[in-house]
């Protein structure tokens, strides 16, 4: 394995993608900065990249690199100081009966069908609601870092695992857990997404890891603004992680 001391981040190469339609802000164009070569980005280097605002999508490690827009703000939750609010406590209590099973990344038809139901129910027309098996696999099941798949099932009266309700993909970093992607049964009343974040915070606590990285907070995007509800949290501004109430901050978008 190539260690960071043998492969400092300065030796990695970074390129900017061509502009493409932004997935979160209608009418905006986005660009990404991608770290290469991907086959040399193992867990230690990847952990440092995440602390510098990068994320992972399959084999690609990237961060926003948009022209004239700084709406995507990296956000992380300090595990020791996190305090759940009333709605988060309700979500935690409501789903305590679910059984979580931590697996290596693997393809299961049941997971894929849930993914399609989620995309069609929550993000219809977003471009991912007709993903093929290959697209699903490349997006979520390919990784060279310490990644895990967590499936959540309801508990039957006899204690056995029942219907699949949610799947989370996460990366275990040197200093925390990075929430990669979560999909679930598209019941807007169930608060599955909030429960997934709470579960990952609890896992980080048990592993004695200080942070849970929630990716990018975007104030103008209802899809992403929920992340500001996990408090206290820190945001990455000018290369520094800063305690902040993200809900009061309005990043530059033009």
Curated annotation (Swiss-Prot):
Domain of life where this protein originates: Bacteria
Any one Gene Ontology MF annotation carried by this entry is: arginyl-tRNA--protein transferase activity
Predominant cellular place of this UniProt entry's protein: cytoplasm
Q: Which reaction does it catalyse?
A: N-terminal L-glutamyl-[protein] + L-leucyl-tRNA(Leu) = N-terminal L-leucyl-L-glutamyl-[protein] + tRNA(Leu) + H(+); N-terminal L-aspartyl-[protein] + L-leucyl-tRNA(Leu) = N-terminal L-leucyl-L-aspartyl-[protein] + tRNA(Leu) + H(+)
Keywords assigned by UniProt, alphabetized: Acyltransferase, Cytoplasm, Transferase
Pfam families assigned: ATE_C, ATE_N
Q: Name one GO cellular component term.
A: cytoplasm
Q: According to its UniProt record, where is this protein located?
A: Cytoplasm
Tagged with keyword Acyltransferase = yes
Look up the EC number in the record and give it: 2.3.2.29
Q: Which family does it belong to?
A: Belongs to the R-transferase family. Bpt subfamily.
What is the role of this chain? Functions in the N-end rule pathway of protein degradation where it conjugates Leu from its aminoacyl-tRNA to the N-termini of proteins containing an N-terminal aspartate or glutamate.
Please identify the protein, giving its name as recorded.
Answer: Aspartate/glutamate leucyltransferase
Species whose genome carries this gene: Polaromonas sp. (strain JS666 / ATCC BAA-500)
């Amino acid at each position: 394995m190539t260690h960071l001391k043998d492969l400092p981040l300065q030796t990695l190469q970074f390129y900017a993608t061509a502009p493409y339609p932004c997935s979160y802000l209608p009418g905006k164009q986005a660009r990404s900065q991608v770290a290469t070569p991907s086959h040399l980005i193992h867990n230690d280097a990847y952990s440092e990249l995440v602390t510098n605002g990068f994320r992972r999508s399959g084999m690609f490690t990237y961060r926003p690199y948009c022209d004239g827009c700084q709406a995507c703000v990296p956000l992380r939750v300090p595990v020791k100081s996190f305090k759940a609010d009333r709605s988060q406590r309700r979500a935690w209590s409501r789903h305590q009966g679910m059984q979580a099973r931590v697996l290596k990344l693997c393809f299961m038809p049941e997971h894929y069908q849930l993914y399609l139901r989620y995309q069609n129910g929550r993000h219809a027309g977003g471009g991912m609601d007709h993903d093929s098996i290959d697209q699903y696999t490349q997006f979520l099941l390919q990784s060279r870092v310490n990644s895990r798949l967590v499936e959540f099932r309801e508990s039957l009266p006899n204690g056995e695992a029942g219907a699949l309700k949610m799947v989370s993909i996460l990366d275990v970093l040197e200093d925390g857990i990075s929430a990669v992607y979560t999909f679930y049964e598209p019941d807007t009343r169930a608060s599955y997404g909030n429960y997934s974040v709470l579960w990952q915070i609890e896992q980080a606590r048990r592993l004695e890891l200080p942070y849970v990285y929630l990716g990018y907070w975007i104030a103008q995007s209802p899809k992403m603004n929920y992340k500001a509800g996990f408090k206290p949290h820190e945001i990455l501004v000018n290369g520094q992680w800063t305690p902040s109430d993200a809900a009061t901050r309005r990043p530059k978008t033009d």
